[in-house]
């Protein structure tokens, strides 16, 4: 069955974004928008879900949904297997882009910048507050590698459970966090007739420059 996509659209009428509402630096505005999303968005939407895009050595982009697990004035933190496809891509090309979309609020935030590993202490601190199943999974799963079937994954998990039957698992060396150090952050607010509000912050030296972009 062929479905027409031409008429699939919604009009955005909830709110606007003016320079008067926007602080001089982007972190305060992100904190405000993120708090709004946590209060407003309902399941299945996760306020901290984001698309993270990386690039491989051939220049081909790859993207996936991850969860934001840390935010401070340094940047935006997420965790993964360092030996995964994204980990290998970041090792070769340490730059990434993130996109948050909060449909109820009709808002989007795009973030671009350089990516660095967090300290082992930061990785361990987050690892230790994860559910036990997730901690075991970080050891069991050879992320991004080809496996025969689901049964193989279950066997790997059983072996990991047996390995740590008498002790708590430590954070694996191949697992940990990345922090995106933003060089550009764009705030997008949906508006009627596709004439959206776009406020862009770009890092120039040590200062943030704020500018409006045409929709």
Curated annotation (Swiss-Prot):
Keyword Oxidoreductase attached: yes
Binding site for substrate: 9-12, 69, 126, 130, 134, 194-196
Swiss-Prot/TrEMBL GO biological process terms: pyridoxine biosynthetic process
One Pfam family of this chain: PNPOx_N
Entry's cofactor comment: Binds 1 FMN per subunit.
Keywords: Flavoprotein, FMN, Oxidoreductase, Pyridoxine biosynthesis
InterPro entries xrefs: Pyridox_Oxase, Pyridox_Oxase_CS, Pyridox_Oxase_N, Pyridoxamine_oxidase_dimer_C, Split_barrel_FMN-bd
UniProt-listed Gene3D superfamilies: Electron Transport, Fmn-binding Protein, Chain A
EC number: 1.4.3.5
GO MF terms held by the record: FMN binding; pyridoxamine phosphate oxidase activity
Keyword Zinc: no
Binding sites annotated in the UniProt record for FMN: 64-69, 79-80, 86, 108, 143-144, 188, 198
This protein's pathway: Cofactor metabolism; pyridoxal 5'-phosphate salvage; pyridoxal 5'-phosphate from pyridoxamine 5'-phosphate: step 1/1; Cofactor metabolism; pyridoxal 5'-phosphate salvage; pyridoxal 5'-phosphate from pyridoxine 5'-phosphate: step 1/1
Reactions performed catalytically: pyridoxamine 5'-phosphate + O2 + H2O = pyridoxal 5'-phosphate + H2O2 + NH4(+); pyridoxine 5'-phosphate + O2 = pyridoxal 5'-phosphate + H2O2
Family annotation (SUPFAM superfamilies): FMN-binding split barrel (SSF50475)
Co-factor(s): FMN
Quaternary state and interactors: Homodimer.
PANTHER family for this protein: PYRIDOXINE-5'-PHOSPHATE OXIDASE (PTHR10851:SF0), PYRIDOXINE-5-PHOSPHATE OXIDASE (PTHR10851)
Function: Catalyzes the oxidation of either pyridoxine 5'-phosphate (PNP) or pyridoxamine 5'-phosphate (PMP) into pyridoxal 5'-phosphate (PLP).
Protein family per UniProt: Belongs to the pyridoxamine 5'-phosphate oxidase family.
Name this polypeptide is given: Pyridoxine/pyridoxamine 5'-phosphate oxidase
Gene this protein is translated from: pdxH
């Amino acid at each position: 069955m062929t479905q027409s996509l031409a008429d699939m659209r919604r009009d955005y009428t909830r709110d606007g974004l003016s320079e008067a509402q926007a602080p001089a630096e982007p972190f305060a505005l992100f904190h405000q928008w993120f708090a709004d999303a946590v209060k407003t968005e309902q399941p299945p939407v996760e306020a901290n879900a984001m698309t993270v895009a990386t690039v491989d050595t051939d220049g081909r982009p790859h993207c996936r949904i991850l969860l934001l697990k840390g935010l401070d004035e340094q940047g935006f933190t997420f965790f993964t297997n360092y030996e995964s496809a994204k980990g290998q891509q970041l090792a070769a090309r340490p730059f990434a882009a993130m996109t948050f979309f909060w449909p109820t609020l009709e808002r989007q935030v795009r973030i671009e910048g350089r990516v660095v590993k967090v300290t082992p202490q930061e990785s361990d601190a987050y690892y230790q507050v994860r559910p036990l199943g997730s901690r075991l999974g970080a050891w069991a799963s050879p992320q991004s590698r080809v496996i025969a079937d689901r049964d193989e994954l279950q066997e790997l998990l059983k072996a990991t459970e047996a390995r740590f039957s008498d002790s708590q698992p430590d954070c694996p060396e191949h697992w940990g966090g990345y922090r995106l150090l933003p060089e550009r952050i764009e705030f997008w607010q949906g508006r009627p007739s596709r004439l959206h509000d776009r406020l862009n912050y770009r890092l120039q030296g040590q200062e943030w420059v704020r500018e409006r972009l045409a929709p």
